[in-house]
């Protein structure tokens, strides 16, 4: 078992990134990515692939307490720096502290600012009473959280972002503990470091939207549920924490809650834990959970799932036809059935500048590239888990990740970075396991994957430029 991030893999990743960037920039020279985002991407890629190998070795000798202290300190420092810099950057280019195209962010802020001056009775009636939205509760969680922050601190925009930096840093510790329990202490530390240095997790701390809090709840749900399933003794707090966490996911995005319940049921069904081998107990747990789903999910849950499912036709068909009409015939082949098999590698990195609305994707291109490159280790992890007959131990993370990403990839949002982001906590765990199980035979395949990654980035650049009729 490899217990550190190998330097030679990091060097390959960096070289592959610059080869991809140079090829895309030269071929689509007129639409080359803005220089500021090239610099930002270079910083993020260097930070991730230089410091992860170094710290995975240096921090392996630390006590758990010191490791957690170092991990949180690094994570929160990086995130706070980004929060401050992005705040003033957005003020400079937009005149307000919101990113380009921040309709959702401004909506959340405006609603929370307005409701923060109202009574709690009015607030709960607004969200849960007769006047509540017909779309259900799937977008209630973040507005409630944000207006609570505003009630305490006032409608100061930077305060929630500072809290996001702390929440995201805490998530790094959760990912470490989950991975350490599932695999090995030193392997778990690699997962924590990668989480701390993951560019998109840093960038989202500067956004006024729900993704950071949502990812924290996803990671906490997986960690607490894994603890529950592996523990031989149960107490009310352990059980209630898992239930409350999966319940909270329904308040952020119904599909997340469904994926969480599905993952729990799958884990119980295939668990090798001695305490879960009592057939009657297993049937009782599954039966009770199914009953809860039927009772609680008869309305809004199925409505949102159906909406995502229906969009796999209406959304993606409309997008493909529009793009094809503008000269990119490849768009006709970007169906859900094509995108779904690539779900562990999505989204592709945007290394071209086609319009000002896309600058957010340019800013996040480094994080998307890391997902493209590290997908190799997710595939290796799945292969090794099956080969070694250890897949039952990892059903919780795997079932959640693929249940969620599967629905998204078939719904017309197959390359939407924001919609794919909730799969990242599970993928971080899978990357770590695949990396730890790398063998000489599988390592040889990495050079072919690097070529494939270059083709991914070039192909996506062609798709972005062609879909807008720019050549």
Residue ranges with predicted function:
Residues 16-23, 76-79, 241-244, 389-409:
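Transmembrane alpha-helix segments characteristic
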Residues 53-54, 344-391:
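Hydrophobic, aromatic-rich transmembrane alpha-helices
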Residues 57, 162-182, 376-381:
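Transmembrane-helix motifs of polytopic, lipid-linked glycan transferases
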Residues 63-70, 234-240, 272-289, 439-451:
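Membrane-interfacial entry segments at the cytosolic side of transmembrane helices
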Residues 158, 175-197, 395:
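Transmembrane-helix signature of polytopic, membrane-embedded enzymes
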Residues 176, 181, 232-237, 358, ...:
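Membrane-interface helix-loop-helix junctions at transmembrane boundaries of multi-pass membrane enzymes
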Residues 202-203, 237-260:
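Membrane-interface alpha helices of multi-pass inner-membrane proteins
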Residues 206-214:
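Short acidic/glycine- and proline-prone juxtamembrane loop motifs at membrane-interface regions
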């Amino acid at each position: 078992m490899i217990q550190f991030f190998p330097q030679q893999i990091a060097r390959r990743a960096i070289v592959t990134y610059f080869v991809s960037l140079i090829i895309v920039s030269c071929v689509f020279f007129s639409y080359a990515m803005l220089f500021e985002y090239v610099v930002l991407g270079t910083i993020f890629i260097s930070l991730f692939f230089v410091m992860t190998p170094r710290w995975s070795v240096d921090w392996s000798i630390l006590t758990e307490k010191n490791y957690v202290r170092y991990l949180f300190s690094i994570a929160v420092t990086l995130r706070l720096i980004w929060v401050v810099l992005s705040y003033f950057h957005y003020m400079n280019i937009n005149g307000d502290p919101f990113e380009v195209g921040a309709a959702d962010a401004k909506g959340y802020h405006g609603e929370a600012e307005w409701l923060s001056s109202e009574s709690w009775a009015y607030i709960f009636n607004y969200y849960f009473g007769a006047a509540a939205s017909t779309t259900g509760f799937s977008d209630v969680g973040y507005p409630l959280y944000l207006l609570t922050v505003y009630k305490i601190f006032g409608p100061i925009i930077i305060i929630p972002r500072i809290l996001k930096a702390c929440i995201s840093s805490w998530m790094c510790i959760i990912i470490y503990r989950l991975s350490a329990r599932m695999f090995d202490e030193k392997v778990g530390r690699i997962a924590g470091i990668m989480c701390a240095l993951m560019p998109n997790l840093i960038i989202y701390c500067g956004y006024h939207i729900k993704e950071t809090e949502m990812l924290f709840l996803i990671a906490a749900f997986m960690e607490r549920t894994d603890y529950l399933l592996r523990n031989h003794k149960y107490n009310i707090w352990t059980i209630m924490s898992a239930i409350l966490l999966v319940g909270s996911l329904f308040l952020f995005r119904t599909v997340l809650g469904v994926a969480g319940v599905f993952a729990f049921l799958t884990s119980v069904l295939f668990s090798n834990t001695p305490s879960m081998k009592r057939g009657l107990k297993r049937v009782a747990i599954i039966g009770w959970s199914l009953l809860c789903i039927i009772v609680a999910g008869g309305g809004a849950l199925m409505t949102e799932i159906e909406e995502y499912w229906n969009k796999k036709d209406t959304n993606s068909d409309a997008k493909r036809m529009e793009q094809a009409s503008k000269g990119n015939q490849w768009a006709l082949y970007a169906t859900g059935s094509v995108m779904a098999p690539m779900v562990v590698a999505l989204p592709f990195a945007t290394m071209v500048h086609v319009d000002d609305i896309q600058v957010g994707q340019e800013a996040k291109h480094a994080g998307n590239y890391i997902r493209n490159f590290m997908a190799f280790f997710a595939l290796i992890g799945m292969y090794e888990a099956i080969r070694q007959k250890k897949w039952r131990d990892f059903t919780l993370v795997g079932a959640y990740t693929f249940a969620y990403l599967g629905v998204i990839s078939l719904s017309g949002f197959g390359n939407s970075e924001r919609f794919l982001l909730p799969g990242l906590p599970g993928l971080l765990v899978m990357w770590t396991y695949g990396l730890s199980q790398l063998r000489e035979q599988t390592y040889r395949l990495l050079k072919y994957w690097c070529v494939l990654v270059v083709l991914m980035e070039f192909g996506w650049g062609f798709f972005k430029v062609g879909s807008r009729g720019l050549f």
